[in-house]
């Protein structure tokens, strides 16, 4: 079978460069396009060189329609507005769209859902094996404990991250809510400040820390009377997300249109 032809969106970004490196070291995939923002000073530069590799001849472009003509998939770790624009093109082309972008609003998520009758989308706030296993464990623990155990999700990321809570924190919150059979939107406590009043029983709390170069730390704390259970994951290198995204693209290649998650890719949906 021929190699899966992939476009990296946000090729000049932190994840974009990691994805270019991951593609170069993975069998069965090849980089055929590199997308950057219109007006970016990186347009025209070589994606390999930007990723710290030898030149690979793939120049950064802002024209996804042209790039996608000969592609099988797009790996998209950009910003919500770009991802929403890319969704329409990927759907029209019928190519796999792996979405790692976080900070998507509920209306962004509705747009993504609306194209999945013709698009093959794998979307997750975190593409690593470890975090998806953590999510499965969180769901199981939340199912076993009653609301006498307060659930708090704490995350820390590098100083350049622009959204909070992280996509991973929200994914873990969804897992905890699923374990408790409640809707996260009705039970989340975000951004406490000032005289907040006592904690509401059943809330799932979120706290975000930013600083330095932290790749991504997440903890789920189950705080009960006189005891606490803590589940945690610490990402040490962005390559775990990049390799996860490639696994997702290869898994989705040839699948029916639909909206899939990393739990589907990793076989953890029924864990
Ligand atoms: N799901 C997961 O496993 C992971 C998700 N992420 C998420 O991925 C996203 C990117 O993270 P990161 O790489 O650190 O961020 P960066 O800011 O380093 O990279 C984003 C890149 O996207 C580019 N971009 C902006 N607009 C467009 C556009 N219209 N078309 C193409 N490219 C565009 C930016 O260009 P410019 O700088 O010129 O604006 C930038 O190069 C974030 O939402 C982050 O939370 C990150 C790691 C793992
Ligand atoms: O912006 C990042 O860096 C990361 N973003 C994702 C998130 O929002 O959870 C995944 C990872 O934690 C790194």
Swiss-Prot record:
Cross-referenced PROSITE patterns, in alphabetical order?
A: DAPB (PS01298)
Q: Which CDD domains match?
A: DHDPR_N
The protein's superkingdom reads Bacteria
Active site, UniProt feature: 157, 161
- Give the pathway: Amino-acid biosynthesis; L-lysine biosynthesis via DAP pathway; (S)-tetrahydrodipicolinate from L-aspartate: step 4/4
Look up the EC number in the record and give it. Answer: 1.17.1.8
PANTHER family registered for this protein in UniProt: 4-HYDROXY-TETRAHYDRODIPICOLINATE REDUCTASE 1, CHLOROPLASTIC-RELATED, DIHYDRODIPICOLINATE REDUCTASE
For this entry, the protein name equals 4-hydroxy-tetrahydrodipicolinate reductase
């Amino acid at each position: 079978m021929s190699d899966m032809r992939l476009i990296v969106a946000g090729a000049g970004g932190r994840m974009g460069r990691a994805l270019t490196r991951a593609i170069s070291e993975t069998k069965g995939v090849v980089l055929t396009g590199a997308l950057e923002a219109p007006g970016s000073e990186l347009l025209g530069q070589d994606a390999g060189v930007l990723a710290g590799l030898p030149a690979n001849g793939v120049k950064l472009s802002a024209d996804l329609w042209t790039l996608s003509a000969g592609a099988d998939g797009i790996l998209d770790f950009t910003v919500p507005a770009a991802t929403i624009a890319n969704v329409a093109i990927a759907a029209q082309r019928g190519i796999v769209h792996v979405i790692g972008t976080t900070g998507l609003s509920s209306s962004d998520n509705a747009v993504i859902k609306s194209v999945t009758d013709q698009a093959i989308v794998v979307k997750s706030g975190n593409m690593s094996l470890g975090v998806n296993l953590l999510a499965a464990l969180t769901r199981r623990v939340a199912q076993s404990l009653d609301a006498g155990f307060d659930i708090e999700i704490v995350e820390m990321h590098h100083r350049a991250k622009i959204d909070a809570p992280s996509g991973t924190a929200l994914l873990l919150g969804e897992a905890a809510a699923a374990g408790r059979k409640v809707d996260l939107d009705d039970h989340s406590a975000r951004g406490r400040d000032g005289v907040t009043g006592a904690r509401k029983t059943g809330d799932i709390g979120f706290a975000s820390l930013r600083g330095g170069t932290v790749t991504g730390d997440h903890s789920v704390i189950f705080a009960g009377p006189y005891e606490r259970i803590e589940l945690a994951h610490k990402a040490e290198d962005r390559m775990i997300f990049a390799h996860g995204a490639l696994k997702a693209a290869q898994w989705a290649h040839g699948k029916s249109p639909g909206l899939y998650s990393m739990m589907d890719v990793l076989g953890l949906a029924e864990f």
